[in-house]
Curated annotation (Swiss-Prot):
It comes from the Bacteria. It comes from Nitrobacter hamburgensis (strain DSM 10229 / NCIMB 13809 / X14). GO terms for molecular function: acyl-phosphate glycerol-3-phosphate acyltransferase activity. Its EC number is 2.3.1.275. Keywords: Cell inner membrane, Cell membrane, Lipid biosynthesis, Lipid metabolism, Membrane, Phospholipid biosynthesis, Phospholipid metabolism, Transferase, Transmembrane, Transmembrane helix. This is Glycerol-3-phosphate acyltransferase. It is found in: Cell inner membrane. It is a multi-pass membrane protein. The chain crosses the membrane at residues 6-26, 72-92, 113-133, 154-174. Pathway: Lipid metabolism; phospholipid metabolism.
Amino acid sequence: MLSSAIAVIAFAIGYLFGSIPFGMILTRIAGTQDLRSIGSGNIGATNVLRTGRKGLAAATLVGDMLKGTAAVLVAGLLWGSAAAIAAALGAFLGHLFPVWLKFRGGKGVATYIGVLLGLFWPAALAFCAIWLLVAFTTRYSSLSALIASFATPLLLWWLGHPQLALLLAVLTLLLWFKHRENIRRLASGSEGRIGAKA
C-alpha cells in the first residue's frame, strides 16, 4: 500500500513536470506573439498552430505529452503503480493550473494523452484514433478531445482497469471544465477550426 508521504511526493513530482509551459517557452524563444493574447488564449499546441508555426505546434504537442509520460514513468519506477497514478493526477493538474503562470494553464489534451501513454499505452492509441477520426471529419480540435476523453474511461473500465478508469474519469471532468468556453462556442457555431489563424 502506498504511504501518504510517497503519494504526496509522487503528486508533487507530477505537478512540477506538468507545470512546464512548453507552448509559452517555445513561442517566446521563436519570438512569436504571446499565446494568451491570440485565438483561444490557450498555451497548448492547437493555439500555437494558430500562429501559423506548424513546427512549434508539433514541438509543443510532444513536450506537453512527454512531460505527462515522464512523470508517470518516474513515479512508477520509483514507487509502483499507485504512485504513478498520483503522479498522473499531479501532472495533469500542473498543466491545467501551473504555478509559474498564476495557475492559468492549458486545457490538458496533450498531457492527458501523455499520462495515458505512461499508464496504459493501448488506451492512448485509442484516444488518438478517436481524436483523429473526429478531427478529420469535423476540423474541430475541441470536439475531438471532448469525444475521445469521454470514451477513454469507458474503454478502460470495459478492459478491466477500474482504477485507471476512475482516474481518467476525473481527468475527463477536468478537461471538460477547461473546455467549457469551447463547448459554448461549439453550440453557437463560432468555434475555430483546426488550422485557422488567429
